[in-house]
Amino acid sequence: MRTAVRSSAVRSAKKQQQHRIRTVARAEYGASGTSFYTTTEKQDSYPSLENILDKHCADATLKACIKELLDGCADITEALRSALVTVEGTDNSFGDKQLSVDVIADNIMWDLVKSSPTIAYGASEEEPVMVKCSGSDYTVCWDPLDGSSIVDNNWAVGTIVGVWPKNTGTGDDGMLGATGRDQVCSMVALYGPRTTVIVTLDDGVYEFSYGCTPEGCQLPDGSFEPWICSRMNIKINEDSKIFAPANMRAAQDTPGYKAL
């Protein structure tokens, strides 16, 4: 009898301790108890895309180009929500098997680039040949869907974009010798539980979030639009843990991965 009472008391004490741990976890971590909330404080509303570009992108033509590229990221977001991932039976120029979502994302980017009044040349990782477009100002190169091989497992994937002034380098397309330092803008879109796009502007790096609610994202004036600025002046800490699930093979022989 005494043993049973002691066992019951131990179980009760353990439950109380677990409850305290869960309470602390909820106070310090995200709702799942497994990940920190972002350091961004909750606000009733956030700056609009237009507001940030007006303040932090002095070139009106570049501003228009950025907005067009973000429209492309929004279209890819919607396509990924409904597209079935299938093998197309074709390879890209690097010998990678193309998936349906690769082709869909690349077609969205090409449609945008070829119709843009600001883009003079375009090239895709799927077929890295510079194509003359109808615009007049920039050369845009992109990977339409980085990590597409894991999208069917519901991992996050992304679009990577670089923007250069046309004729930055030499050669017929003006890109021979051009480097990343010559870019006037770069963008990384992440399509996960939500879509965010990291964009470099005149004075730093900004994060824009897409479609925060079915109505859109709320602005300071109470209205809604597709994009809001969710973080400003983003920096990568010198000591960070960054892991790429699509690069698991590197964990076998890369010391940095093992150290995680």
Q: Which positions does each model-derived feature cover?
A:
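N-terminal mitochondrial targeting presequence
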Residues: 1-32
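IMPase-like, lithium-sensitive Mg2+-dependent phosphomonoesterase catalytic core
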Residues: 26-87, 92, 97, 103-260
